[in-house]
């Protein structure tokens, strides 16, 4: 299956994300350098998605390029099924994470990066994403869909913070 958007890999660089898409970028401090390795394991194991309330089925236990995943969630009476594939993995000494891109059937069309970064004596988590409506109902639901996306982003960050605190 092909990705549902042409800018595959664009989340690698903030400046190369498409200007005509809804763009999200949020960072949060998790703690000192001691939480870096556990945070990386949590993120690569799809912990942010699970911690935000998504049921995640993935073809590998940890994110690697080509991993296929399906996320499922309920938002009130609405059930969402969101297939995606890992586009790339970052595995550097002080930066680790992955980005996934949407596949046919996903309500949105775009890419999302989940990154853990050690900066001096602090560990940070960052989410960087761009998206456009991918289905008729996300086009129709415009502002509500953006609100749900914003809530999901905060829930991802909350899940990472809770995990870093030992929860």
Residue ranges and their predicted role:
Residues 75-120:
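Hydrophobic-ligand binding "helix-grip"
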Residues 40-48, 105, 121, 158, ...:
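Short, intrinsically disordered, mixed-charge
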Residues 1-76:
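Hydrophobic ligand-binding cavity/cleft-lining segments
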Residues 102-147:
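Beta-strand/loop substructures that line and gate deep hydrophobic ligand-binding cavities in soluble
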Residues 148-167:
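Long, compositionally biased interface segments
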Residues 28-30, 71-73, 88, 118, ...:
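Hydrophobic side chains in beta-strands
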